[in-house]
From Swiss-Prot:
Database matches in Pfam families: Actin
Origin species: Homo sapiens (Human)
Lineage start: Eukaryota, Metazoa, Chordata, Craniata, Vertebrata
Protein's name according to its UniProt entry: Actin, alpha skeletal muscle
Result after altering R185D: In CMYO2A; requires 2 nucleotide substitutions
Entry EC number(s): 3.6.4.-
Amino acid sequence: MCDEDETTALVCDNGSGLVKAGFAGDDAPRAVFPSIVGRPRHQGVMVGMGQKDSYVGDEAQSKRGILTLKYPIEHGIITNWDDMEKIWHHTFYNELRVAPEEHPTLLTEAPLNPKANREKMTQIMFETFNVPAMYVAIQAVLSLYASGRTTGIVLDSGDGVTHNVPIYEGYALPHAIMRLDLAGRDLTDYLMKILTERGYSFVTTAEREIVRDIKEKLCYVALDFENEMATAASSSSLEKSYELPDGQVITIGNERFRCPETLFQPSFIGMESAGIHETTYNSIMKCDIDIRKDLYANNVMSGGTTMYPGIADRMQKEITALAPSTMKIKIIAPPERKYSVWIGGSILASLSTFQQMWITKQEYDEAGPSIVHRKCF
């Protein structure tokens, strides 16, 4: 491991649901914690308890019963900068235990991130944390690097947003990027709703976290939704039980695949959007005819919401149905795809050829925050 080397770069992937942070050159992030800031709902009565006015990450998660939880990143885009600063502070000082002023820092951003946001990230890094150098990379591009490719189309689906990003020779093609505001958090909400129909009530932000756990442990994508519904109706072979924190055991049946089916049929939650298979196809069709073949053959999945068992087979089936019949279609779903953005960042930041790409403190002082548009693309 490489903490001793004072110039090791830091890699911080700020997701809507989880922050993944660690050192460039490592093969996995050192710290993975929820992107949440919690504030007490009640006035503290225990004097001398050292109660804080805010909690971040796992600590907020463990005290969730008495806190109001807020996510500063919505749909992949930072919306609350004060809370975001708290999260970064927690990342550097409590999780990684490093002094940010000693390490170049690679941050990630959502595709089509507003320009003002990139500038604000740059400004906070240099002015609040005094980093010596920094870089902002697009999440989907890093996932592609992590799979060992420079051309392909990435389906990146996390907690807050889903994107289809076609990439050719390392460059994202912005005109063909598709954004779908439907991701893990919406699936959790939908599961809360359909479990309520079974008579189980989940309402608070704390209970939502329980449902998220049920979703991650028990949900899967059906290859054929109608068939699966019929099977679920006629037998109990698909039923699974889950023990709640208070010891009560609940049973869940067709909810297991009805929940992630929303990715393919957003109308389940009242959205008019196309499903992820259609957005992938539409994104490919917006690209130059000459590169489509390469994109069809390199469909890379990344992000936690692509972790459902069965999703790759279903995707293969759906895209095959949409694409020209002779087209070779390949879905790449690496087992570590939950962290592939971070892994790609770790690879990128440790390449010798990348070292001249960093925005240095000196360049920032000369040009100001807008330097990020010139150096990071």
